[in-house]
Amino acid sequence: MNLLINGLALLTVLLAMLFFLIFLGLFALYIANKKAFPKRMLITFASCVALFLALMVYNQYFFTFDRIDKAHTQQVARPVESPNGAFTAEAFYEFYGGVLGGVNVIVEVTDNKNVETKIIYYAEAKAFVSLVWRDDETLAIYNEDYNRNPNDEVVLNVSNEIYHDRGLACQSVLLRKKFKTCYEDNK
């Protein structure tokens, strides 16, 4: 879905640039020869710009994790069950961009009682990923580089907190309703 929206946005920008160049040519003719003002071309260009802006707003403020392609994920380690057995946490790698791309890490928590699964952590993957339950509802996620920086730990209450390193989940109107607190990387 995200690829479709980004492709449509790119096509819209290219069309807007083409229409803008045509508009500039017609506007130059209007100035030089007093031809009719190119209203239709101006309206077409403005429509392309409006469509592009609408797609960008949709992409930014209506973000969901449904856009993750599960076919391109790989489980990092075995699932880790909470001390009371109410939740199970799993970490996955999401590969993107082919040879020149990268890897994101996703932590998904399943409520074993209601059999509901939700993503609570999404970030650029580093060298080591591990999950440790602190108590029945608190999960520590270590996404560490080779230097073992102590700031690479994120502790979340799995019931109502979420982390997205780029902040898209924090800006999303749809995800804000599901989570009480949202964290993002402030680097």
Annotate each language-model stretch with its function.
Residues M1-A32:
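Membrane-embedded alpha-helical segments of integral membrane proteins
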Residues L55-V115:
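N-terminal export/targeting and maturation segments
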Residues T117-Y121:
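A short beta-strand motif characteristic of beta-propeller blades
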Residues V80-G85, S130-T138:
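Blade-terminus and WD-like Trp-Asp/Gly-His loop motifs, strongest in beta-propeller folds
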Residues R40-F62:
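Internal/C-terminal transmembrane anchor helices
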Residues I31-L42:
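Membrane-interface helix-boundary motifs at transmembrane edges
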Residues A123-A127:
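Short coil/turn segments at the loop-to-beta-strand junctions that recur within blades
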Residues P150-K187:
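C-terminal partner/receptor-binding element of secreted or periplasmic proteins
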